[in-house]
Amino acid sequence: MEKLLIVNADDFGLCKGQNYGIIDAFRNGVVSSTTAMMNSVDINHAAELSAQYPALPVGMHFVLTFGRPLTAMPSLTDANGELGKWLWQRAGAGTLDLNEIAQELECQFERFSAVFGRPPTHIDSHHHVHMLPQIYPLVAAFAREKSLPLRIDRHEVQQHGLTLDNPRSSEWFNAGFYGENLSEPSFLQLLEHADQQGVNSLEIMCHPAFIDQTLMTSGYCYPRLTELAILTSPTLKPAIAQRGYRLGSFLDC
């Protein structure tokens, strides 16, 4: 039986280098889906590229840890009005304002529809914040309300004891294509691991990009260029097919 592989490029809209890298990996490689950051400075540029390449499915990358929110979020922003990774400290302290988060989720969704002219194909999140135990029920309910698939990290489900209410998703998600020691064989090992688990639909996260001044300030910079080289390798797509996978998106879930 042919299996589904979703190669989803996160961070669409982060900057032009990221946007161009994702499009290149879609046109000339194995990226089959992407998710957009609606509070990022180059989101309109991403939407322009999306209009040029409408075959690329675009979902929403819900953001609570980067940039400025679209709504007032005094409980999660610093003195400069910026979001940050202190979200986990607030979560650990039990001080998350879920009403603020729900309003921001709705606003990012509405902006997606306005900017891209259509709803997202699915929802995931920056730094996987939607898998936090306090936030997951909120985002899962929102996805069900909008009839949208949702990225589900089964490791996080087990770790936090989350209850899955039959969400539309891939059977498995793997965040392992990330870091300093990436290669084509390491990408293919993720498929082999999924096979060992008997998985018929797999999502792999990636961040292919060309380096620009914005990415030079990121803690995850040059590996994005390595990802792009691997994902556009002429031997990768045939190797995926040889392992019984077809490339697709959350529209196939």
Swiss-Prot record:
Transmembrane segments: none annotated. The keyword Metal-binding applies. Its cofactor is Mg(2+). Mg(2+) binds at H61, H126. Pathway: Glycan degradation; chitin degradation. The keyword Metal-binding applies. GO terms for biological process: chitin catabolic process; diacetylchitobiose catabolic process; polysaccharide catabolic process. It is found in: Cytoplasm. Keywords: Carbohydrate metabolism, Chitin degradation, Cytoplasm, Hydrolase, Magnesium, Metal-binding, Polysaccharide degradation. GO terms for cellular component: cytoplasm. It catalyses: N,N'-diacetylchitobiose + H2O = N-acetyl-beta-D-glucosaminyl-(1->4)-D-glucosamine + acetate; diacetylchitobiose-6'-phosphate + H2O = N'-monoacetylchitobiose-6'-phosphate + acetate. SUPFAM superfamilies: Glycoside hydrolase/deacetylase. InterPro entries: COD_ChbG_bac, Glyco_hydro/deAcase_b/a-brl, YdjC-like. Signal peptide: none annotated. One of its GO terms (molecular function) is chitin disaccharide deacetylase activity. Its EC number is 3.5.1.105. It comes from the Bacteria. Involved in the degradation of chitin. ChbG is essential for growth on the acetylated chitooligosaccharides chitobiose and chitotriose but is dispensable for growth on cellobiose and chitosan dimer, the deacetylated form of chitobiose. Deacetylation of chitobiose-6-P and chitotriose-6-P is necessary for both the activation of the chb promoter by the regulatory protein ChbR and the hydrolysis of phosphorylated beta-glucosides by the phospho-beta-glucosidase ChbF. Homodimer. Belongs to the YdjC deacetylase family. ChbG subfamily. HAMAP family: COD. This is Chitooligosaccharide deacetylase. The lineage of its organism: Bacteria, Pseudomonadati, Pseudomonadota, Gammaproteobacteria, Enterobacterales. The gene is chbG.
